[in-house]
């Protein structure tokens, strides 16, 4: 007699095993290399500027092109992942950004480098959201928030590592060598992912793959053998309209739009600080080596904040936790501007900003994965990240604009604090929106993040 097993209930009843930790580690390494690239470009920018005798304004297209590619990659690869699978898309995207990062090292001029940074961004933008989706779909409800944020700490650690390593190695190997390093490592990882990274069992069920294939995938997670078993998902079947339209179906529209505002504002801050902080500090007379350590405090704070918020989000109302965190982040941003004459006080304020802003962004990614069902989850996460990348483009460009307008140091950071306040307000409104049971799809009952 065929037994029927609901996948999420099965995952919830089992401990987190070796197969799930393998997925977490693989995805951790992917986002770590993404973080490395994000930070490295900010630290090699002064060397590129000197190499081609550019102005600060000339660097804006370099930052903007990569972020435009990130946006396009997220928009394209979310629906592709929902159709062709998480594993294939992640592997392809990692190989893509590795290849074009390597080619960027040999760009003959700024125009070609800008073009290659756009192509690098396509791979980066497609990989990151799908790692969130993949990790989320492998985990039991009780551990999902904490473990997805743990996985995404790879981004903040990669950013901290990329900044410090770039600052130390640029005098030795130049900006070309940093881009070679940033290209070779993803290519090695892409090859390793082929045998190491399994496919999502939720995607396999939703795409109606043979039950024997699903049984092997699930058996590798639980350590059990499943003969004559039918696996199913306790969520609505995919509709005819496709995964994109489901983001805006009924009252889901309000939740999607509010999420997008938070993503836009949050990544605006993160990329503005990541791209321009070394230049801003250098402009204040701080040498690049010291600037790298001070800027690394932002990413280290983000790692600490992500781990802390992941635990708090699993225990308390996640929307309120993130709203409070963004509010505290806004206060710390203001403190950066008020501490321009005290390097250690500035580093402490930047560390606090990392906790409140970068840490919250990691938590926001984990939260978003719970708000959409399997058939539209990768699209929902990817499109939210794509909107966030639009904010990142605005942030990376606005840093140069504010410097050109000769904003004072404290005024500049007062302006940067405004998006953090907006994010906090939107999350408070999201708390009200998700109280309505008709607002959220059936992904929430099995989500690892609950309202209290």
UniProtKB/Swiss-Prot annotation:
Organism, as annotated: Klebsiella oxytoca
Record membrane topology: Multi-pass membrane protein
Keywords: Cell inner membrane, Cell membrane, Membrane, Transmembrane, Transmembrane helix, Transport
Gene3D superfamilies per the UniProt record, alphabetical: MFS general substrate transporter like domains
Signal peptide, first to last residue: none
Protein name: 3-hydroxybenzoate transporter MhbT
Subcellular location: Cell inner membrane
Lineage: Bacteria, Pseudomonadati, Pseudomonadota, Gammaproteobacteria, Enterobacterales
Biological function: Uptake of 3-hydroxybenzoate (3HBA).
Principal place of residence: membrane
Reported induction: Induced by 3-hydroxybenzoate.
Family named by the database record: Belongs to the major facilitator superfamily. Aromatic acid:H(+) symporter (AAHS) (TC 2.A.1.15) family.
GO molecular function: carboxylic acid transmembrane transporter activity
Coiled-coil ranges from the UniProt annotation: none
Transmembrane stretches, start-end: 22-44, 59-81, 88-107, 112-134, 146-165, 175-197, 253-275, 290-312, 319-338, 342-364, 385-407, 412-434
Pfam families: MFS_1 (PF07690)
GO cellular component, one term: plasma membrane
InterPro entries: MFS, MFS_dom, MFS_trans_sf
């Amino acid at each position: 007699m065929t037994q029927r097993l609901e996948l999420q209930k099965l995952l919830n009843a089992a401990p987190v095993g070796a197969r799930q930790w393998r997925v977490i580690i693989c995805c951790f390494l992917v986002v770590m290399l993404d973080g490395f690239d994000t930070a490295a470009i900010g630290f090699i920018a002064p060397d590129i500027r000197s190499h081609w005798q550019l102005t600060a304004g000339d660097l804006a297209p370099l930052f903007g092109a990569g972020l435009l590619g990130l946006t396009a990659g997220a928009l394209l690869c979310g629906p592709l992942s929902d159709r062709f699978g998480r594993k294939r898309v992640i592997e392809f995207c990692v190989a893509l950004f590795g290849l074009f990062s390597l080619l960027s090292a040999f760009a003959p001029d700024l125009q070609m480098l800008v073009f290659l940074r756009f192509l690098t961004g396509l791979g980066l933008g497609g990989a990151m959201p799908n790692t969130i989706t993949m990790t989320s779909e492998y985990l039991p409800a009780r551990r999902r928030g904490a473990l997805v944020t743990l996985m995404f700490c790879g981004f903040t650690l990669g950013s901290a590592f990329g900044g410090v390593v770039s600052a130390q190695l640029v005098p030795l190997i130049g900006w070309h060598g940093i881009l070679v390093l940033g290209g070779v490592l993803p290519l090695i990882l892409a090859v390793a992912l082929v045998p190491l990274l399994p496919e999502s069992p939720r995607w396999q069920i939703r795409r109606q793959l043979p039950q024997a294939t699903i049984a092997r995938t699930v058996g590798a997670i639980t350590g059990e053998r499943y003969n004559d078993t039918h696996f199913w998902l306790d969520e609505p079947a995919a509709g005819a309209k496709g995964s994109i339209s489901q983001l805006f179906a009924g009252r889901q529209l309000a939740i999607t739009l509010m999420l997008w505002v938070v993503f836009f504002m949050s990544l605006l801050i993160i990329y503005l600080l990541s791209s321009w902080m070394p230049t801003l500090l250098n402009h204040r007379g701080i040498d690049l080596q010291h600037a790298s350590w001070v800027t690394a405090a932002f990413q280290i704070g983000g790692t600490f904040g992500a781990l802390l918020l992941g635990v708090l989000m699993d225990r308390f109302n996640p929307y309120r936790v993130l709203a409070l965190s963004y509010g505290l982040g806004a206060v710390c941003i203001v403190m950066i501007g008020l501490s321009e004459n005290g390097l250690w006080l500035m580093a402490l304020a930047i560390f606090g900003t990392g906790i409140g802003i970068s840490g919250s962004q990691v938590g926001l990614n984990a939260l978003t994965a719970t708000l959409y069902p399997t058939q539209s989850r990768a699209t929902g996460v990817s499109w939210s990240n794509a909107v966030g990348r639009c904010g990142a483009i605005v942030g990376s460009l606005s840093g140069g604009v504010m410097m050109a307008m000769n904003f004072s140091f404290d005024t500049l950071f007062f302006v940067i604090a405004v998006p953090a306040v907006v994010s906090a307000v939107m999350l408070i409104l999201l708390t009200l929106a998700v109280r309505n049971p008709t607002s959220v799809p059936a992904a929430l009952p099995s989500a690892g993040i609950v309202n209290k």
